């Protein structure tokens, strides 16, 4: 069992139940999935760029990403409908907890000039989204083999109903929030 899943079941869930004052165990907020998305606009001109992005995301997530295609043609961006424009991967269960562990304990501390995560990154329903500017903060990516620094979006979906519940959940997982 993943270290953070064990911590959630044994420590975080009972603490949140008491803190939030919920009667039913199923009402305790929990993380349902983590989605990693890498938009690669340069993939239009060069297919090799997308292959490198897919390889990087596969190393970071530990599973094969799916290639996302453009939904609409946009002349300003020189994009046609159906062209590959990025890749994404959805993590659930064990892999999700293992990624979360690496994110909180290894990757976030390696971010340059890091001053904490803004609490404004919640969507109003307890889900949390953050952007990472460089994929090299993850230990799986070797700096010498990176062709270009790419960022990625990390979206953490929870069963929390409000931002406060979501923040309490992620704070219990030792997310470094500001203030």
From Swiss-Prot:
- Gene3D superfamilies xref list: 3.30.1440.10
Name a single GO cellular component.
ribonucleoprotein complex
Q: Which GO terms describe its molecular function?
A: rRNA binding; structural constituent of ribosome; tRNA binding
One GO term under biological process is: translation
- Keywords recorded for this protein, A-Z: Ribonucleoprotein, Ribosomal protein, RNA-binding, rRNA-binding, tRNA-binding
Q: What PROSITE patterns does UniProt report for this protein, alphabetically?
A: RIBOSOMAL_L5
A UniProt-annotated Pfam family? Ribosomal_L5_C
Q: Signal sequence: where?
A: none
Q: Which InterPro entries would you find in this protein's record?
A: Ribosomal_uL5, Ribosomal_uL5_bac-type, Ribosomal_uL5_C, Ribosomal_uL5_CS, Ribosomal_uL5_dom_sf, Ribosomal_uL5_N
Name the NCBIfam families on file. Answer: PRK00010.1
Q: What exactly does this protein do? A: This is one of the proteins that bind and probably mediate the attachment of the 5S RNA into the large ribosomal subunit, where it forms part of the central protuberance. In the 70S ribosome it contacts protein S13 of the 30S subunit (bridge B1b), connecting the 2 subunits; this bridge is implicated in subunit movement. Contacts the P site tRNA; the 5S rRNA and some of its associated proteins might help stabilize positioning of ribosome-bound tRNAs.
Q: What HAMAP family has UniProt attached to this entry?
A: Ribosomal_uL5_B
Q: How does it assemble?
A: Part of the 50S ribosomal subunit; part of the 5S rRNA/L5/L18/L25 subcomplex. Contacts the 5S rRNA and the P site tRNA. Forms a bridge to the 30S subunit in the 70S ribosome.
State the similarity comment. Answer: Belongs to the universal ribosomal protein uL5 family.
**The protein's name:** Large ribosomal subunit protein uL5
Origin species, per record, is Teredinibacter turnerae (strain ATCC 39867 / T7901)
What is the name of the gene encoding this protein? rplE
């Amino acid at each position: 069992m993943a270290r953070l899943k064990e911590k959630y079941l044994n420590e975080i869930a009972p603490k949140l139940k008491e803190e939030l004052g919920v009667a039913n165990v199923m009402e305790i907020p929990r993380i349902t999935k983590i989605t990693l998305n890498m938009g690669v606009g340069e993939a239009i001109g060069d297919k090799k760029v997308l292959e490198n992005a897919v390889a990087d995301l596969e190393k970071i997530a530990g599973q094969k990403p799916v290639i996302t295609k453009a939904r609409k043609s946009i002349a300003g961006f020189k994009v046609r409908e159906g062209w590959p424009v990025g890749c994404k991967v959805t993590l659930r269960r064990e892999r999700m907890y293992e990624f979360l562990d690496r994110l909180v304990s290894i990757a976030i501390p390696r971010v340059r000039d890091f001053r904490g995560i803004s609490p404004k990154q919640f969507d109003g329903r307890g889900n949390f989204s953050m952007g990472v500017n460089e994929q090299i903060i993850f230990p799986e990516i070797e700096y010498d083999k990176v062709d270009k620094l790419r960022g990625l979006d990390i979206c953490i979906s929870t069963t929390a109903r409000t931002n406060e519940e979501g923040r309490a959940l992620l704070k219990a997982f030792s997310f470094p929030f500001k203030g």
